[in-house]
Amino acid sequence: MEASYDIMSRTEPGNDQIASPKERLKRCEIDADNVRYPYCMVWTPLPLISWILPMIGHTGICTSEGVIHDFGGPYYVAVDDMTFGNPTKYIPLQLDETNIDDWDRYVERGDKAYGQMMHNLCCNNCHSHCAYVLNQAKYKGNTGYTMIHIWWMFMIRSKYVGFSVSFIDHYQFIGIHQIIYWIHGHTYDSCFTILFN
């Protein structure tokens, strides 16, 4: 079944009124094959960094049509081409009447603001870009989202795109640590003995 993402103008059959926000959100379908995640935040691993620390990754935020926007580097916001590859996790956002109609405008504001900013891994990054959009939209009545809030949301609320990417994400972490153990087994064991005794 092919999904249509023109939900802002979609109407019920025989009804001239635009569908309610809740109806529009229900009709939004995640289409991982075509990399479309309407009204979602998305996450992808950072090469090497996420293999060692799997809780660290790169985020983006999606329009009503599912197009990904991500702050990919200094003065650069990628659109429909996520900087570090296709998402492996996503969070469907729970929007309401107060912010769904202008959602794309909030994403555009975030792009405009972050397209003029220097990227910094520690304090002005892709997570900050997502937080900015949520603050503009007053997501869940809040305007105080930070990069830490976005990180935490991905830790507790994200869903994997599929089993295979879930397996690969975890396998990379286990594989890297297994290689470290093979190379420096005695040192690795000593570190854990010191830490946990």
Q: For the regions a protein language model found, what residue spans apply to each?
A:
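Non-catalytic ligand/cofactor/substrate-binding and regulatory segments of enzyme domains
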Residues: E2-P47, L53-N124, N135
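Activation targets extended, charge/polar-rich intrinsically disordered C-terminal tails
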Residues: E2-E12, K112-N197
